[in-house]
């Protein structure tokens, strides 16, 4: 695989991980409220 495609895949994976973390944090905040 070429470098640009690898970089795009990593960016997408990082964005997905950040979205999951944000959702988990929001759920924790809602549960604590």
From Swiss-Prot:
Alphabetical UniProt keywords: Antifreeze protein, Repeat
Entry function: Antifreeze proteins lower the blood freezing point.
The family this protein is said to belong to: Belongs to the type-I AFP family.
Record-given protein name: Ice-structuring protein SS-3
Organism: Myoxocephalus scorpius
């Amino acid at each position: 695989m070429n470098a640009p495609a690898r970089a795009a895949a990593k960016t997408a994976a990082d964005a997905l991980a950040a979205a999951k973390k944000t959702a988990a944090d929001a759920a924790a905040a809602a549960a604590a409220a």
